Amino acid sequence: MIPVRGFEGKTVAVFGLGRTGLTAARALIAGGAKVALWDEKPESRQAAVAEGLNVVDLTTSDWSDYAALMLSPGVPLTHPKPHWTVGKAKAAGVEVLGDIELFARTVNAAPEHKKPKIIAITGTNGKSTTTALIGHLCRQAGRDTRVGGNIGEGVLGLEDMHGGAVYVLELSSYQLDLTSSLKPDAVVLLNISPDHLDRHGGMDGYIAAKRRIFLNQGKGDTAIIGVDDPWCQQICTEITAANRRTIWPISAGKAMGRGVYALQGVLYDATGERVTEMADLLRARSLPGRHNWQNAAAAYAAAKAIGIPAHQAVDGLMSFPGLAHRMETVGKLGKVRFVNDSKATNADAARQAMSSYPKFYWIAGGVPKAGGIDDLVDLFPRVAGAYLIGQAAEDFGKTLEGKAPARQCGDIETAVAAAYADAVASGEEAVVLLSPACASFDQFADFEQRGEAFRAAVNGLGKPAAKRA
């Protein structure tokens, strides 16, 4: 745990008692603060009381008693409308912050010899894979590495800092909205496409949240920016003009005079005086597809930015084992391979997986995002069959009509069985791809549970029907 500094003897209100909120409360107490915890779910309050934490009804308490409000990232700060705790905090002149901000202030207050290296990663898609990949590269190079934030452990639950440590942090737009003091040694902005627009008041607000990750960088720091979409390209241009830090653009599709890029699966380093071919990513263990080439370019650049030798970074790329639910092969029956890409919760993420196969049997659906799958129409000729589930099934069927064969399946078990039957009937090598292009909350707790349901359905195909039931 990282004890939070700066609130010794003061009381911090904490709203939202999930993983982030409880971890922050413990870290605040460890640093000498007092806490007042609240959650609208009675079971969450009861769990906090059982742990011996101080639960206070923030709807009726005196907010002038609080030095700050620690808001969990899932709670709206501004849109669709500010949460009631935000209103009470602002009315009382109480600052609102998140766990990443608490971490940042603690780092900033530490003596120079105790300050760790920080690599911060954001973007619409690929954050978790890139974060895990950078963590793997750092560990393989012998660095004392802690990976967390929006992936795995909450940042304040990670092991306490020292001067030789490296913190590799995935940051969501929600977390960045609540952060103002973080100063990463290396920042990775992978890509931007429309997502979470209801929480940011539109595309401009979403881009502004992502851009906050660069707020405090200066001389000696490195900004690593994907330039394969227009929004990130614009940010790269503007930040380069500011001329305050090292800028390394990254791309998975175009050669550049400076930065790191991949062409046809070959990774090139153009951060020095000449362009050097570094690795054949087609031979990497778990980095299939163009989107993963961008992730690899980002990870290589981030490792180099904190002083890891190029050959060690390349070794890490080649040995990376991959992450569950991100283009994860979960089984093969005969000629049919099953790929779990449950993390694809929007169309742009699904595009990355769909672009990796010339033909596939596609399981899609759930809670749709704005625009549905309209932007994927250019990939429909690759769809040998679509098997639709969840709330989006009917609308997706209409979008696919006349463009690709589609079937209403309702649930994931039915979809897997139908896709497998059609794939076998083709007599060819085939891929059944779960890449839903939707959130999961209509049928599952989260994308992980959806991915595990897919895995279970695939495993069930190899068993007699009576046992599957």
From Swiss-Prot:
Record keyword Secreted present: no
GO cellular component: cytoplasm
Biological pathway: Cell wall biogenesis; peptidoglycan biosynthesis
Gene Ontology biological process terms, A to Z: cell division; cell wall organization; peptidoglycan biosynthetic process; regulation of cell shape
GO molecular function: ATP binding; UDP-N-acetylmuramoylalanine-D-glutamate ligase activity
Protein name per the record: UDP-N-acetylmuramoylalanine--D-glutamate ligase
Record's keyword annotation contains ATP-binding: yes
Keywords: ATP-binding, Cell cycle, Cell division, Cell shape, Cell wall biogenesis/degradation, Cytoplasm, Ligase, Nucleotide-binding, Peptidoglycan synthesis
Pfam families reported for this sequence: Mur_ligase_C, Mur_ligase_M, MurD-like_N
Organism: Caulobacter sp. (strain K31)
Cell location: Cytoplasm
Entry's family note: Belongs to the MurCDEF family.
Gene from which the chain derives: murD
Catalytic reaction(s) noted: UDP-N-acetyl-alpha-D-muramoyl-L-alanine + D-glutamate + ATP = UDP-N-acetyl-alpha-D-muramoyl-L-alanyl-D-glutamate + ADP + phosphate + H(+)
Functional summary from the UniProt entry: Cell wall formation. Catalyzes the addition of glutamate to the nucleotide precursor UDP-N-acetylmuramoyl-L-alanine (UMA).
Transmembrane segments: none
Principal location class: cytoplasm
SUPFAM superfamilies: MurCD N-terminal domain, MurD-like peptide ligases, catalytic domain, MurD-like peptide ligases, peptide-binding domain
Residues reported in the UniProt entry to bind ATP: G123, T124, N125, G126, K127, S128, T129
InterPro entries associated with the record: Mur-like_cat_sf, Mur_ligase_C, Mur_ligase_C_dom_sf, Mur_ligase_cen, MurD
Enzyme class: ligase
EC number: 6.3.2.9
